[in-house]
């Protein structure tokens, strides 16, 4: 029975004496079914059977460990990718939130200005209408004048920003 070179990480071909002088490579030992292995083990000594089964178990465990490492690395990469995407989304939402807060503050200021204006218009007496259109207008109602003036102010401030 020969043993593989321990210095090399790659699996070396290991030959085991088998039935009718046949030998098994590590790959064959790992890939064969239990039934095939048992057929191959017939006629070998108890010690050889134990060594061969131990070798098979060691090789299979090595394979499982390798696939586990690959799976762990893949999962880690996927989680890091998801983390980056979520961080980008958080930054985007924080930016939108800040923008909406600014917009809300601007709207509050406009609202307060409109309320102040409406109060001043409601307190001040309305001057009678003059000019050529005055006859067709009739008496001016303070609420309507104030609403028209307020709308004009809002539109002119909005247009000035654009």
Swiss-Prot record:
Effect recorded for residue 53 to A: Abolishes acetylation. Has no effect on binding to NFE2 but impairs the DNA binding and transcriptional activities of NFE2
bZIP domain residues: 51-114
Modified residues (Phosphoserine): 124
GO biological process, any: regulation of transcription by RNA polymerase II
Per UniProt, location of the Glycyl lysine isopeptide (Lys-Gly) (interchain with G-Cter in SUMO2) cross-link in this chain: 14
UniProt keyword list: Acetylation, DNA-binding, Isopeptide bond, Nucleus, Phosphoprotein, Repressor, Transcription, Transcription regulation, Ubl conjugation
Entry protein name: Transcription factor MafG
